[in-house]
Amino acid sequence: MTVKVEKEIAGRTLTIETGRVARQANGATMVRYGDTQVFTAVTSSSARFGMNFFPLTVDYREKTTAAGKFPGGFIKREGRPTTKEILTCRLIDRPIRPMFPDSYTKNPAVADTSVAAMVLSVDQENDPDVLAGISASAALSVSDLPFLGPLGTVRIGLIEEEIIVFPTHEQLKESKLDLVVAGTMDAVTMVECGAKEVSEEKMVEAIAKAHEVIREIVEMQNELAEKVGKPKMELEDLPDNSEQKAELKVKYFEGFREKLLTEGKHARSSAVSEYISACQDEVSPEPEEGAEADASLPDRDLVKSLLRDLADESERELILSGTRTDGRSYTDIRDINAEVGVLPNRVHGSSLFTRGETQSLVSVALGTGKDQQIVDGLGEEYKERFTLHYNFPAFSVGESWPNRGPKRREIGHGMLAQRALANVMPTEEDFPYTVRIISDIMESNGSSSMASVCGGALGLMDAGVNIRQPVAGIAMGLVKDGDKTAILSDILGSEDHNGDMDFKVAGTQFGITALQMDIKITGVSQELLAEALEQARGGRIHILKEMLKALGKPRDDISPFAPRIIQIRIDPEKIGLIIGPGGKMIKSIQEETGTTIEIENDGVVTIWSTDMEGAKGAQQKIEALTEEVQADRIYDGKVVSIKDFGCFVEVLPGQEGLVHVSELADGFVDKVGDLVSIGDIIKVMCLGTDNQGRIKLSKKAAEGGGDGDGDSKPPPKERSREGGGDRRGGR
């Protein structure tokens, strides 16, 4: 039985439907907005023992048939996920993952759970990513899987200070804000955005508006679940270890406080681990080799797990008491060291940004238009001229794992940093280079994506990229227990792990350029969000000041090893002259000058070269090719062909005109070949063009003989009849 709920939101109808397809899944829904439609199914397999994490998999795929297209490339079938698909997977995963109860995710026998979303139709106006988030929540809500939702997801734009709900693609091009918010009926749980220096106050207002719409979407899902929702599966309660935990807390809790205050990430981690092992051995000694475990003693693995929980709780209590593990106050920023030009200038720009025990080594490359990334998705194909790639190697945290390409986390962090910097990049007209940033995390103890933003901004300035404003980023945290609340600036890795919120903010001194927030608790009030944003602004300004000590503004010139560029504009109708037949002319210019030449349809010609002299040489050749032949001007031209009625002379590269026999000399000319030969360089004057635009030339006018009007004519009996006389004109 097909059941649907509908509601008009922002002038279009949002429809959530279930019961038509994928009836063997635990839950499945179709969500439609305009003509964009997304399907999502959720399933759960048999439980597995021994898992120490929640095996949730989110998969989002965009089928090109949804846009009436074929996949690009040789193989006409969807392959590995695109960057957009990976980012959307994260957009779905992040808000729903905390919404599964502990009795499901921490059960000794935890089940593999998958969320599979597919785009079935796209109207080129409404992005399917937010609809996939709604569809995933709705599918979980009508399924028998335990879920603490529903969740709503909405996109918000900002045009001329007006907040736009579910903006279209065209509206987003004008918008200062691309904000995606997810939340429950009571609170916001996830925020993701790129912005053009939007103020903190406007950001809070936009998030508040998003939450109003989220409530409407949640109501729709509740209505659907009431109609056709399956009874939720019964779960066994988690073992009650509260008494054992309380005993351990009385005995060992204060010891954790001392160990947590150890200076240094690895020293602190080792001190806590050694303390846990010592406590474990004291409570439940490991049996000697070959001996059986004492059944009267607590289970060693359970004791270790409870002690780890106590270590986490101890850090939270320590923070709420006003002390952080590294001794900082809530608003203190770790020591910052920023350097630029740390790599040889073969690298077009570089920086090393260190904040505490987090370090980003940034390298920047400047390229030509050929280096732009072609993006072929469901919409029109386009090119990206700015990219940032983030790498998180194992050595950055002192560990070892195989490097098999970027993981979803690396792609997500890289895109967050890219958004933060993209909105201060110069326009293509002002800086026509393609720009690539690589951020290699050399050390990590929290906030590595924001270190990439800071290092990236410095690297761009070192490369001579005239960004509008320098950008800094900061990661904020939250620890909340009842009425006690601690908002933390520049969080450590352990504060991220044990806290209730991970809140990253990047921006200039004037406003926010990127924001990402994930909340592990049921939600955060708008007042608390506003307070966190304001505290983040103070930290951001402090970091900017420290960064600018290394380099106050973009360098005046680019690296000598970066490609040089000259841009000129020509008449679009003359593009063919530069290209030549079969590309012969442009290839010749490029080979002779050692340049790369790109021509846009609007007549903008871009000349690239590592040698400025070569670029100038190519410019001169192009300008000569496209120069207009001017009437009454004398040219040194080359005779390229001889006819009975005159000769054709090349006066500018690729531009020929006719010197009629009557314009070769005073008096009667019997044979053209008697006066000129092919290859001769002769002076000619341009007499203008005929009614077909063909160039008319005169040799005798250039030499001062005659008036250029063709006053010398042969006797009628010797008049040539071949070739149609002067009606042939020039070419």
Question: Each PLM stretch: what is its role?
Answer:
Residues A25-T113, V119-N126, M185, E192, ...:
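Glycine-rich, flexible beta-strand/loop modules in the N-terminal catalytic cores of phosphate-handling
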Residues D144-E263, L460-D556:
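Mobile "lid/hinge" segments at catalytic clefts and subdomain interfaces of large enzymes
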Residues T2, I9-R12, N26, F53, ...:
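Alpha/propeptide regions of enzymes that mature by internal proteolysis
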Residues M1-S44, G50, M233-E380, P563-L577, ...:
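Extended amphipathic alpha-helical scaffolds
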